[in-house]
C-alpha cells in the first residue's frame, strides 16, 4: 500500500512536522493554550523545542510525556497497569473502553513508555472532535488518524473500508500500535459493550477470512478505570439535552471544554489488560 492513499486521515509524516509547528505557533488559540500550560515560558523557547522533534514520537516524549508526568504528580494519586504478559516488541490494536477524550490513549502511551516500549500507538479519533483547525493539527501531530463520521451512507462505506485498510497498514507496514475505542464516543452511561460496527469495520481490510483479518490486527482488549470522572456532569448534561431538546447538537467548543476538564482533574487511574492476547 502507498501511504499517500491515506493522506486525508493519517497522522502527519515526519517531513511535514516543521510546517505544522510553524502553523501552530502562529495560531492565537494554540498560543493561549501554551501560555496556560507553560506559564512564563517564552513561545520562542517552546517553538525551538518543538522544532527539535524529528518525529511524532519525539513530540510525544518531549511534550506529552513530561506534561502527564507533572500532571499525575500534582493532581493524581497515581496510575497502575501491568504489561508483563504483553509482548511489547510486537504490535497490537488496543481496543479500549472510552471515558476521557484525551487521557484514555495518553495514559496508555505514558505507561507504554515507562514499560520500555519503543513506540506508543496511533490513535483513532472522530472527526466530530476536529472542528477547530489547530486542534486537528495537534491530534494529527500526536499520531492520531481520523474516523470520518458525518458522511452519507455510500461515502461512509468507502470511508470505513479506507479506515480498515489503514489500520491493517499501520500494524503490518508502519510497524506501530493502534488505540481505538470499542464504541463511537465515550460511554456516558458506563455501557462498555463493544459495538458490532467496530468489529465489522476491522474486517473490511486485510486478507483472508473474517477471523484471519481480525487476527492480523493483534487485538488486545484494554479497560481503563478512573477513581473519579471530572467530566461526569458534562456527560450528564449532554445526555439530558439530547433527551429533552429536539435536534440538539454540541457546539464547536463543547468537546474542547471536556478535553480541558478531563486533563486538569485527572484522578487515580488503572489500566487492565488481559493475561494473554485474545485475537
Where do the protein language model's features map onto the residues?
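Glycine-rich, often proline-containing surface loops adjacent to acidic residues and nearby aromatics
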Residues: 87-91, 140-147, 176-183, 271
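Membrane-associated lipid acylation/remodeling enzymes share a hydrophobic transmembrane-juxtamembrane segment
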Residues: 161-261, 274
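Membrane-anchoring hydrophobic helices of lipid-metabolizing enzymes
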Residues: 1-109, 113-120, 136, 140-143
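Conserved small/polar residues in nucleotide/adenosyl-binding loops
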Residues: 269-275
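Conserved nucleotide-cofactor-binding alpha/beta core module
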Residues: 122-146, 150
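A conditional alpha-helix N-cap/helix-loop micro-motif detector
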Residues: 74-76, 156-161
Amino acid at each position: 500500500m502507498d501511504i499517500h492513499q491515506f493522506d486525508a486521515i493519517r497522522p502527519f509524516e515526519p517531513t511535514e512536522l516543521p510546517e505544522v509547528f510553524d502553523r501552530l505557533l502562529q495560531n492565537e488559540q494554540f498560543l493561549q493554550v501554551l501560555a496556560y500550560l507553560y506559564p512564563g515560558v517564552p513561545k520562542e523557547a517552546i517553538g525551538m523545542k518543538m522544532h527539535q522533534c524529528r518525529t511524532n514520537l519525539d513530540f510525544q516524549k518531549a511534550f506529552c510525556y513530561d506534561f502527564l508526568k507533572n500532571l499525575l504528580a500534582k493532581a493524581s494519586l497515581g496510575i497502575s497497569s501491568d504489561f508483563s504478559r504483553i509482548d511489547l516488541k510486537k504490535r497490537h490494536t488496543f481496543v479500549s473502553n472510552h471515558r476521557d477524550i484525551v487521557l484514555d490513549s495518553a495514559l496508555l502511551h505514558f505507561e507504554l513508555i515507562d514499560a520500555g516500549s519503543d513506540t506508543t500507538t496511533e490513535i483513532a479519533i472522530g472527526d466530530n472532535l476536529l472542528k477547530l483547525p489547530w486542534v486537528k493539527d495537534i491530534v494529527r501531530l500526536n499520531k492520531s488518524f481520523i474516523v470520518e463520521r458525518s458522511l452519507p451512507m455510500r461515502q461512509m462505506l468507502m470511508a470505513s473500508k479506507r479506515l480498515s485498510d489503514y489500520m491493517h497498514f499501520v500494524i503490518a507496514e508502519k510497524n506501530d500500535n493502534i488505540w481505538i475505542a470499542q464504541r463511537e464516543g465515550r460511554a456516558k452511561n458506563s455501557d462498555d459493550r463493544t459495538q458490532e460496527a467496530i468489529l465489522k469495520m476491522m474486517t473490511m481490510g486485510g486478507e483472508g477470512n473474517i477471523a484471519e483479518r481480525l487476527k492480523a490486527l493483534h487485538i488486545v482488549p484494554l479497560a481503563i478505570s478512573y477513581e473519579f470522572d471530572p467530566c461526569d456532569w458534562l456527560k450528564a448534561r449532554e445526555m439530558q439535552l439530547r433527551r429533552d431538546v429536539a435536534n440538539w447538537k454540541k457546539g464547536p467548543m463543547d468537546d474542547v471544554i471536556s478535553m480541558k476538564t478531563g486533563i486538569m482533574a485527572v484522578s487515580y487511574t488503572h489500566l487492565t489488560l488481559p493475561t494473554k492476547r485474545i485475537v
